[in-house]
Amino acid sequence: MGAAFLSSWPWDNLGAYKYVLYAPLVGKAVAGRAWERASPDHWLLLLLVLFGVRALTYQLWSSFSNMLFATRRRRIVRDGVDFGQIDREWDWDNFLILQVHMAAAAFYAFPSLRHLPLWDARGLAVAALLHVAATEPLFYAAHRAFHRGHLFSCYHLQHHSAKVPQPFTAGFATPLEQLVLGALMAVPLAAACAAGHGSVALAFAYVLGFDNLRAMGHCNVEVFPGGLFQSLPVLKYLIYTPTYHTIHHTKEDANFCLFMPLFDLIGGTLDAQSWEMQKKTSAGVDEVPEFVFLAHVVDVMQSLHVPFVLRTFASTPFSVQPFLLPMWPFAFLVMLMMWAWSKTFVISCYRLRGRLHQMWAVPRYGFHYFLPFAKDGINNQIELAILRADKMGAKVVSLAALNKNEALNGGGTLFVNKHPGLRVRVVHGNTLTAAVILNEIPQGTTEVFMTGATSKLGRAIALYLCRKKVRVMMMTLSTERFQKIQREATPEHQQYLVQVTKYRSAQHCKTWIVGKWLSPREQRWAPPGTHFHQFVVPPIIGFRRDCTYGKLAAMRLPKDVQGLGACEYSLERGVVHACHAGGVVHFLEGYTHHEVGAIDVDRIDVVWEAALRHGLRPV
């Protein structure tokens, strides 16, 4: 049986090419020099600007909704927005394409609309009257109809498939529903124009006001103070709240109104708990995370790869895209402001086995970690974040990449020694990182070459491999540091650790483990067919086409993870860096020790097996 009439968009298969549907209007505006006030096509420019601002309105509300650092206490549905919902709502703006053509058709059908005055205050009164007398009751009736039988299962069910209401959910509906909504929106404007009081300002004010209220109702954050409705009880029936509309999404048999609960009162569909729940939500309750991954920003471009900037972009692995370039100056200014004033903040969350996991960001960028004068400030930020997590009652804090740099804080040792009474466990996650790298090395490998060999990870990998009788060429100029590591191996295994000081020593070795940056010249020493395993931050650039390059050590989260909707840097969906996964394992296993400082080589296999047992999988 085919799909119901007007239940899917005609341009569903076009992807981003759907925006070509704007081309006739844009082309007409350009050809008619619509930017000139005297142009007969000036109305086209105003129309396109209006719809551009409409799209921006929903985007700004989406950004607000996903600013967990500012809104998490007043979130109504506490779950995160997962990849499934993001994908379903990817084309949320389809209704704008439909409605811009509906509006253009109206302008062509009624040429007098092209010459509206800029402002007429009387039109506002007419539009307000018709909104209350026509749009609100008609929407209420239509909405209730869409909740019955065939109309719900074939049309409105799509809108209600969103587990967590979001501003983009407001636009996520079928063509039939958007045609009805577009017609209802037009009633007040048409009435004002018919009465001779239409204006450009009225069109902008009414349409943008309509969009703001729709986005607000779906934002999943309570924006009204509870005391407002106690002080002015009549407002309860004149304006809905995000909590009020979220109840409709959860119960589906109550709170059908467009913006005015008065019509639910008249229709007998007003949920009695709406205002009590609104009061409770507006008071704000902070949910305590049990696991915190303390990340940092990589660079200015990557700072845009977060849900509160562009949700859909954050749901895909990071890569520099052309549309980001105009945003770079703004992102650079934000970087300066964060450097000056910001503290660690929440960027995203998910749930695993019913427990809340949060990602916090230290407001520092990759280059900051290489500035000597910035060291104390970074450590202070990390320390405050750990103390905050400890005070909240979190169980584990895992340090990302540069936040656990040996030269910065000894892999977290600084904080554990300074605060011996910490209840939260501090974890660098390097034990699992080492395990991931080691398990990537093919069985039967007899020789490897390693840079960064005397680092924390390099030491652990070298000692583990020599126990397996794998010859490890450790690239280091420091004989003292090499010998210190070699002495940690048992006498019968020390022979497998070999110090080398030149890259040419590895010209016949096809397994390179990279813990220190490699230039193109240095990479040329690798023979064809070499695979570069990496634990260097940032990862090296793959210059050799006849070689393969691994990504940073990572693992896939268990299948039962919920509410995960953002990719971790350039990793695939559901995949996190090994240091993140190491913290998760530490939490799930209930380990009571801090994992800081040197890696315990004896625990590498223990942690690896625990990760697999809990459902984490190698990539």
UniProtKB/Swiss-Prot annotation:
Q: Name one GO biological process term.
A: lipid biosynthetic process
Keywords of this entry: Endoplasmic reticulum, Lyase, Membrane, NADP, Transmembrane, Transmembrane helix
Q: Which Gene3D superfamilies match?
A: NAD(P)-binding Rossmann-like Domain
Q: How does it sit in the membrane?
A: Multi-pass membrane protein
Every Fatty acid hydroxylase domain range: 129-269
Which PANTHER family does the record associate with it?
A: STEROL DESATURASE (PTHR11863)
Note the superkingdom of the native organism: Eukaryota
Xref: InterPro entries = CER1-like_C, Fatty_acid_hydroxylase, NAD(P)-bd_dom_sf, Sterol_Desaturase_Related
Name the chain's protein.
Very-long-chain aldehyde decarbonylase GL1-1
Report, as the record phrases it, the tissue specificity of this protein: Expressed in germinating seeds, embryos, radicals and leaves.
Q: What is its main location?
A: endoplasmic reticulum
Q: What induces it?
A: Induced by drought, cold and salt stress.
Q: How does it assemble?
A: Homodimer.
What's the name of its gene? GL1-1
Alphabetized GO MF terms: aldehyde oxygenase (deformylating) activity; iron ion binding; oxidoreductase activity
Keyword Disulfide bond attached: no
Q: Where in the cell is it found?
A: Endoplasmic reticulum membrane
The reaction(s) this protein catalyses: a long-chain fatty aldehyde + 2 NADPH + O2 + H(+) = a long-chain alkane + formate + 2 NADP(+) + H2O
Q: Per its database record, what is this protein's job?
A: Aldehyde decarbonylase involved in the conversion of aldehydes to alkanes. Core component of a very-long-chain alkane synthesis complex.
Q: Which GO terms describe its cellular component?
A: endoplasmic reticulum membrane
Q: What is its EC number?
A: 4.1.99.5
Organism lineage:
Eukaryota, Viridiplantae, Streptophyta, Embryophyta, Tracheophyta
Q: Which residues cross the membrane?
A: 44-64, 93-113, 123-143, 190-210, 322-342
Q: Which organism is it from?
A: Oryza sativa subsp. japonica
